C-alpha cells in the first residue's frame, strides 16, 4: 500500500485523541513492508 492509503487507514483506525501517535507511525513508515 502507498503512503496515502497507509495514512488513511491510520485515520480510520485511530481515534482523534490519538492523532499524535499518527506522527510516530509516519516516522516509522519505512518499516512497513
Swiss-Prot record:
Pathway listed: Glycan biosynthesis; sucrose metabolism
EC number annotated for this UniProt entry: 3.2.1.26
Active-site residues (renumbered): 18
pH effect summary: Optimum pH is 7.0.
Induction remarks: Induced by sucrose.
GO biological process: carbohydrate catabolic process; sucrose metabolic process
Keyword Transcription set for record: no
Keyword Hydrolase attached: yes
Amino acids binding substrate: 15-18
Top class in the EC scheme: hydrolase
Any GO molecular function: beta-fructofuranosidase activity
Family of the protein in this entry: Belongs to the glycosyl hydrolase 32 family.
Name of the protein: Sucrose-6-phosphate hydrolase
Record organism: Fusobacterium mortiferum
Amino acid at each position: 500500500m502507498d503512503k496515502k492509503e497507509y495514512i488513511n487507514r491510520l485515520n480510520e483506525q485511530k481515534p482523534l485523541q490519538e492523532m499524535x501517535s499518527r506522527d510516530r507511525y509516519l516516522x516509522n513508515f519505512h518499516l512497513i513492508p
